[in-house]
Amino acid sequence: MEEIDKSISFDGRDIRLKVGLFAPQAGGAVMIESGDTAVLVTATTAKGREGIDFLPLLVDYEERLYAGGKIPGGFLRREGRPPEKVTLTSRLIDRPLRPLFPSWLRDDIQIVATTLSMDEEVPPDVLAVTGSSVAVLLAKLPFYGPMAAVRVGLVGDDFIINPTYREVKNGDLDLVVAGSPQGVIMVEAGANQLPEQDIIEAIDFGYEAVCDLIQAQREIIAEMGIELVELEPPEVDPTLENYIKEKATEQIKEILSQYDLDKNQRDEKLDEIKDSLAESITELPEEEAVRAMVESESMLLGNAFKSVTKKLMRQQIVAEGIRVDGRKLDEVRPVSCRVGVLPSRVHGSSLFNRGLTQVMSAVTLGTPGDAQELADDLHPQDEKRYLHHYNFPPFSVGETKPLRQPGRREIGHGALAERALIPVIPKSDIFPYVIRVVSEVLSSNGSTSMGSVCASTLGLMDAGVPIVKPVSGAAMGLIKEDEEVRILTDIQGIEDFLGDMDFKVAGTDSGITALQMDMKITGLPIEVIADAIHQAKPARIHILDKMLSVLDLPRPDMSPYAPRLLSFKIDPEMIGLVIGPGGKTIKGITEETGVKIDIDDDGTVTIAAADGEKAKQACNIIQGMTKKLNPGDVYVGRVTRIIPIGAFVEVFAGKEGMVHISQIADYRVGKVEDELAIGDEVIVKVREIDSKGRVNLTRLNIHPDEAAAARANAMNY
């Protein structure tokens, strides 16, 4: 294969596409590079399996630790279970790619993206998304592309394409835009309460760069003599669908217009119609085509019935502006909330209901030592102080399934809800706790991730976390029939399943904190996306008002079972003194007081205890140890050693000075032991600190007021 190397520049940063050199047996392969980050993306296909009614697309993203010059930990020294970032990147590649394959395609397709080199500036995820499109084109698969993705950052007042890690961290926006020639196809964003118009402009800015990358892909395949594969869909025999339309259209319409039915009732009635159709088909003569079709393939009837139902529901929304539950296009389902739904052993809890969707969130407050360390990870990132985990048990949709580890969907939904709250989590110097929120989906009928955002907000406030502002979220949908477009507010399950878009928007009353948009069509113009973003705001504010009617401010007090934290700074040079040889000193403090102590490299000490008084005791011990002594200071100390020329007195844990025999009393002392014994409590004054740092103490010339103040201070230590 001919080797081609094509480069395109954004804001002085090049993206290079190299084809024809790597993975010659893959259907298509490209090395996509920027800076020292390089990702190999391959696309391979195999003949489809019998009896499946979906596109078997498998997307895997992997990172090799040698890409960052690292050797894996553990006994085997091999990459182990992939970190969460790998799962999220796999989803990021899959989401814009899947809608661009024909809906009728049934071939097995596997995309493998592997980061082979990585610097500390360029994230590999958006490179992998663009690379997946190139690989598919080279594999000559049916594809409505090309497709590309870029990241948009906000530095000052300027948008930039593909910002570095540092620029993303220091900015107010982290937005990924993916698009096709037909328009924007995916959006993923975290933002620091940015106004809607800023987000819209950022998406538009990003799509312009996407178009440049699409053109670069077109030039590559043109140079290689490859044409876009756009096959005609296989002919579908309309006989069965026509039979269903003739026999059941009016019945289905009647069910779809019974607005008082809930999800389960509607599903049951539709199933009854389908079962009745199945029974009527079995009564047809054997030579009838409809009967022969259904008997030859069991899934045909169900698929055809879904197709007819989908078309009728969409027609109802477009023509009448009324949804299956009777709502208008911009109407939110009934919302109700509660807080403190679990006993106070759980540090904070809430229950959020929107229609038949119900999410319970539980909040746990931990110490800085509970922060999540991202081990064996290539990505430069601080420890995570805020963690959100999302669980979706089978009973939430009335199903029975084995319970497994969280899948890609659960990890993705948890990350989205986490991202929505991060901008309002208080800084560690204000609230030093590590926070974990677990959202349990107890009932699902659409938009559980946004339900998790709302439940998390209320749970945090119930736990007494002083969040900057409360956050709410809503999921927007879309029905597109030819040139007719209808945007739906707060979509439920059937609208998500039968619609064309799932657009989740979360934020405060000041602006957006998170976005996630996925399509089932091949792209949308920015104008439609802008309308959806603007339509989401009144829905978010309506939901927020309902939440604040239950709890409008964070509780002033935390659960009595939450750990009490005291945080203060010491001189970093004193850290070794506090820890002691082999950890002896700090271990002694923890054993004496029963607290947990964390010390950061910058000298920040955080003490956690169930008993606030114990935390204060440990705090006073450490502050005393690290306090610098000054001449003239008076302390209550304890005699630790006696030598012929004087006595050593410990004024703080680990800090002592010597009282010379001449400074013990205002008269001549023959032997130190005549005046002092080991363990005696004495009042001493710092006389001097010599050039070697040795502390000389005295018992002379101490005013009674100084002695009284020293005794008062000693009671606090």
Swiss-Prot record:
Keyword presence, RNA-binding: yes
Gene name per UniProt: pnp
Domain (KH) ranges: 563-622
Origin: domain of life: Bacteria
Domain S1 motif: 632-700
Binding of Mg(2+), residues: 496, 502
Originating organism: Trichodesmium erythraeum (strain IMS101)
Record-given protein name: Polyribonucleotide nucleotidyltransferase
GO BP of this protein: mRNA catabolic process; RNA processing
Enzyme Commission number(s) of this protein: 2.7.7.8
HAMAP family with a match to the protein in the record: PNPase
